[in-house]
């Protein structure tokens, strides 16, 4: 299907019975909506539940999520860089996932991934069905119209895939996401997925993670007391959000 490459597992983002069986795609198809911070939170959520996690950063131009996690010496965390700009990149991703069947997969999707996802979406879904994996998507949005337009375009390709839309509360309270809240896109989302609220975190925490390129796991013991307390508050709220979408992992 990708020429000489062999299709195998793809990314599903469902926890259901086992963390290791899901493949997550934090997306949004544009920059600046909070996909990277969401990926930080999702990896932390999995590690806190002792799941095996395979982090794949597809933003090869600015792989901040990869750089923040690659030096963590944890036996249950693997980190990879993988461009999805062409067919070979998608095939490489599938081969990587096949090699780690007992790992939950977190894909930090680059903003430019929309075009290739549209091109290879049907192949991806077919591969998942063959491997008996289920695809679910986290779609992070801000309050702008293009977030809704990009979501609608994505829904046209992935009509049968559960999509969890995450209102990034950094951009305002949930009630202020007027265009999404009253949209037909939301109605479609909530037939198979959920509308979630991704909690805002204090600037001092975000600055610490980004400026030092540190994972949550590595940063926590080094933070000043107040910063660490805010991080812990935010982690707790994020965990409740992930539990509601994925089911409590055990």
Regions found by a protein language model. Give the residues of each.
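Glycine-rich phosphate-binding P-loop
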Residues: 26-40
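Extreme N-terminal, non-catalytic leader segments
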Residues: 1-23
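A general structural motif
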Residues: 21, 50, 102, 132-134, ...
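A conserved segment at the C-terminal end of the G1
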Residues: 37-52
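NTP-binding/hydrolysis catalytic cores, primarily Walker-type P-loop NTPases
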Residues: 209-250
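Conserved catalytic-core segment of NTP-binding enzymes
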Residues: 112-207
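Nucleotide-state-sensitive switch-loop elements of NTP-binding domains
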Residues: 16, 20-25, 48, 54-109, ...
């Amino acid at each position: 299907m990708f020429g000489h490459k062999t299709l195998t597992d793809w990314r599903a983002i469902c926890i259901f019975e086992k963390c290791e069986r899901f493949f997550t795609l934090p997306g949004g198809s544009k920059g600046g909506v909070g996909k990277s911070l969401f990926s930080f939170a999702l990896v932390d959520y999995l590690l806190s539940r002792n799941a095996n996690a395979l982090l794949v950063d597809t933003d090869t131009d600015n792989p901040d999520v990869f750089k923040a996690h690659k030096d963590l010496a944890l036996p249950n965390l693997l980190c990879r860089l993988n461009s999805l700009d062409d067919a070979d990149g998608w095939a490489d991703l599938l081969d990587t996932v096949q090699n780690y069947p007992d790992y939950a997969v977190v894909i930090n999707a680059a903003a430019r991934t929309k075009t290739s996802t549209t091109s290879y979406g049907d192949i991806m879904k077919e591969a998942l069905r063959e491997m008996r994996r289920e695809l679910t998507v986290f779609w992070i949005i801000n309050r702008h119209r293009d977030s809704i337009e990009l979501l609608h375009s994505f829904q046209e390709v992935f009509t049968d895939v559960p999509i969890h839309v995450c209102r990034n509360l950094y951009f305002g309270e949930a009630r202020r996401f007027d265009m999404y809240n009253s949209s037909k896109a939301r109605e479609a989302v909530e037939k198979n997925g959920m509308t979630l609220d991704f909690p805002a975190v204090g600037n001092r925490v975000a600055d610490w993670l980004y400026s030092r390129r540190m994972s949550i796991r590595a940063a926590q013991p080094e933070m000043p007391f107040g910063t660490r307390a805010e991080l812990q508050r935010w982690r707790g709220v994020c965990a409740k959000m992930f539990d509601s979408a994925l089911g409590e992992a055990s």
